[in-house]
Regions:
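C-terminal-of-GTPase-core extension/linker across diverse P-loop GTPases
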Residues: 41-155
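Inter-motif core of Ras-like GTPase G domains
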Residues: 15-40, 52-60
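Generic enzyme active-site microenvironment
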Residues: 1, 35, 67
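Walker B catalytic acidic pair
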Residues: 4, 38, 70
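A conditional alpha-helix N-cap/helix-loop micro-motif detector
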Residues: 12-15, 47
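Glycine-/small-residue-rich active-site loops that bind phosphorylated ligands and cofactors
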Residues: 7, 39-42
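Switch I (G2) and immediately adjacent beta-strands of P-loop GTPase domains
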Residues: 1-10, 31
Length: 155
């Protein structure tokens, strides 16, 4: 388990290499958790920057779960019912956003509120199941295991 630095916008060019070196562990990871502040107005741009950075360091092919945090702080501007102008991203509800991202990512994302502990159990279950996929204990097929099993069941 490793935690990297949070999103840094407009990082000075002199620090880019040292910033990327802190992400070296990403290349060794089995699973990435990309936590996004969904209440930030530029969260989609931040996702793109992180994805580009992951590709730049060779981690773009890693399995990734996108975790949208701060759903309790998400806001939108409600349109009047008779307003026929097209919706902008400021008018999209959280439910509409969930459907959009779920469709884009084949449900490899989760919407949570760490502060309010909303959907935390779902996050734990998702992580448990995903980690279990990567770390299944396997035993070689041989008579030795059957002998141990027989000894245990005959007692």
């Amino acid at each position: 388990l490793s935690d990297t630095v949070g999103f840094i916008r407009k990082l000075p060019t002199g620090l880019v290499d040292s910033f990327k070196s802190t992400l070296d562990e990403v290349r060794e990871a089995d699973l990435l958790l990309h936590v996004v502040d969904i209440s930030h107005p530029g969260f989609e741009e931040q996702i793109e920057v992180v994805n580009k950075t992951l590709n730049d360091i060779g981690g773009g092919d890693k399995p990734c779960i996108l975790i949208f945090n701060k759903i309790d702080a998400f806001t939108y501007v409600q349109k009047e019912e008779d307003d026929l102008t097209p919706k902008t991203k400021e008018n999209i509800t959280l439910e509409e956003l969930k459907n959009t991202w779920m469709a884009k990512l084949n449900e490899n994302c989760l919407f949570i509120s760490a502060r309010e502990k909303e959907n935390i159990d779902e996050l734990k279950e998702l992580l448990y199941n995903r980690v279990k996929e990567y770390h299944v204990q396997r035993f070689p097929y041989n008579d030795f295991l059957f002998q141990i099993y027989d000894e245990d069941t005959n007692e």
